[in-house]
């Protein structure tokens, strides 16, 4: 079967000049799979981003370029629905929370699992997206701060389901 929907979370998209850049406007084209092409061709899609360089931020590119906090060269790829969030993962968790309410079961990861995953990724070489440091942080947020949002979404989702 063919997919009915494409979803992109924190996935770098090419800017108008065809270059893939990270949040610091560094060219990462050689390290980036060109999946934004799929989104250009597919009729139904969701993009979740936080900095302007992600697939879907083409929907708001003219506003991204006016911001001092976001990238200078926004992604050009547009999506059917765009979710903006301070941290892309938080936007994805929000989507999963909404799907949980539709499904009648909490589909969100718990904070213990998420903390273990982040620690494993950092221990395997991942770095924080803001500082570039190998630290237990996500987009500049300390692990506890980052997990607080997931914990609250789990709490709210559980309350709404029961």
For each of these PLM feature ranges, what is it?
Residues 15-18, 53-58:
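Short acidic/glycine-rich loop or secondary-structure boundary segments that cap or lie
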Residues 1-39:
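An acidic, phosphate/nucleotide-engaging active-site surface
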Residues 34-45, 99-103:
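A structural motif corresponding to the C-terminal end of an alpha-helix
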Residues 17, 25-27, 36, 40, ...:
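Acidic-enriched, low-complexity/disordered segments with a strong bias for Aspartate over Glutamate
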Residues 5, 44-48:
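Hydrophobic/aromatic beta-strand patches that form the interior of the parallel beta-sheet core
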Residues 9-12, 48-51, 98:
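Fold-independent oxyanion-binding glycine-rich loops
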Residues 55-162:
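C-terminal functional extensions of proteins
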């Amino acid at each position: 079967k063919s997919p009915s929907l494409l979803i992109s979370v924190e996935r770098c998209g090419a800017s108008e000049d065809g270059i893939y850049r990270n949040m610091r406007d560094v060219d990462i084209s050689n390290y980036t799979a060109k999946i934004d092409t799929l989104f250009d061709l597919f009729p139904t899609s969701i993009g979740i981003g936080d900095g302007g360089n992600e697939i879907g931020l083409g929907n708001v590119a003219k506003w991204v370029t006016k911001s001092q906090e976001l990238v200078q060269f926004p992604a050009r790829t547009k999506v059917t629905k765009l979710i903006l969030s301070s941290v892309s993962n938080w936007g994805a968790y929000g989507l999963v929370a909404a799907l949980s309410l539709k499904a009648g079961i909490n589909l969100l990861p718990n904070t213990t699992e998420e903390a273990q995953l982040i620690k494993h990724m950092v221990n395997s070489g991942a770095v924080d997206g803001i500082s570039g440091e190998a630290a237990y942080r996500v987009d500049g947020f300390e692990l506890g701060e980052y997990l607080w949002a997931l914990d609250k979404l789990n709490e709210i989702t559980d309350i709404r389901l029961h």
